[in-house]
Structure formats: structure tokens, C-alpha cells
From Swiss-Prot:
GO process annotations (BP): ribosomal large subunit biogenesis
Cellular compartment(s): Cytoplasm; Nucleus
Protein name: Ribosome biogenesis protein ALB1
Broad class of the protein's primary localization: cytoplasm
């Protein structure tokens, strides 16, 4: 039979039939595997989730429905899964601790109000001192411009 791109190629009907047969075979295989039983939108759907036979065996879920199985879990793999699950738990705890720290960093509104009240209670001398110190801090925060050479990297003269 000539190839799909040859000059005397077969009719489109043959190609479409072949594609339909392939898709039907894939669909029936997915249905036999139980991937089409719940709709993709439901919570019980396994569609799009990672499938791990060793993890299913470790958790005690049945992978095969028959009495004889070829799926076993080695001791080394079981230890590895156990270690990885501990790491996941530690990571979750770390995320919780970091979230608690983030929420603890919020500024209390009452303390901000009390500091404003203290500054209002002080006299004019204290206000002058604070304004002078704030001006000094502003000057110290500005950039210090350092004079460099006269146009060369070594600082020598530059003749264009």
C-alpha cells in the first residue's frame, strides 16, 4: 500500500477509519483500566493525577484485581517511600511555621497609635530635635558621589 504522502495515496476514508479504530482501542483500554468510570470533572477521577504503583502498594491499595499479581514492593523502595513521606510532612510543618511568622510580623495598629500619641504630648523642643535628626538621617541616606578618573580606567588623561 502506498504511503500517506505518495502521489497515488489511498483515499481519505481509509485513513479516517484507521484513526477511528486507534482511538476506539485507546478509549476501551482506558475504560478497562478504570480511568473513564467517573467523569473527569468529579473528585474521584484519576485523570491527570500521577500514577505510582509502588506508592499504591505501600499504602495497601490494590493495584490488580486478580488473585495473582506481578507487582511487588522491595524493601529498599519501601524505605525510600517512607523517607519521602517524612520529608513531605516536614515540608508541610515548615510552611506552617513560616506562615505563622508572616502573620506574626503584622504591625499592631494600637502600638502605632500609642507612639503617635507620645509624640503629640511632647513639647516644641522635642519636635525641633526630631526634625533635626530626621534631616541628618536624610542627608546620610543620600548617595555619596565619588570623583573618578578623567575618562580612563586608570585615571590618566584622555585625548579624544
Amino acid at each position: 500500500m502506498p504511503s500517506k504522502n505518495s502521489i497515488n495515496r489511498p483515499k481519505q476514508k481509509l485513513n479516517l477509519q484507521h484513526r477511528v479504530q486507534k482511538n476506539a482501542a485507546k478509549r476501551s483500554a482506558r475504560e478497562r483500566a478504570g480511568l473513564l468510570a467517573p467523569p473527569r470533572s468529579s473528585d474521584q477521577s484519576q485523570s491527570g493525577r500521577a500514577k505510582s504503583i509502588p506508592l499504591d502498594l505501600f499504602r495497601g491499595e490494590r493495584v490488580d484485581q486478580g488473585p495473582i499479581t506481578t507487582k511487588t514492593l522491595s524493601k529498599k523502595r519501601a524505605k525510600k517511600i517512607e523517607r519521602n513521606l517524612r520529608y513531605v510532612e516536614q515540608r508541610k510543618l515548615l510552611v506552617d511555621v513560616q506562615a505563622a511568622r508572616e502573620s506574626g510580623m503584622d504591625i499592631d495598629v494600637e502600638t502605632a497609635v500609642s507612639t503617635k500619641a507620645k509624640t503629640q504630648q511632647t513639647g516644641p523642643l522635642q519636635k525641633v530635635k526630631e526634625s533635626i535628626w530626621s534631616a541628618l538621617e536624610d542627608v546620610a541616606a543620600q548617595e555619596m558621589i565619588v570623583q573618578t578618573g578623567a575618562g580612563t580606567t586608570l585615571g590618566g588623561q584622555f585625548f579624544p
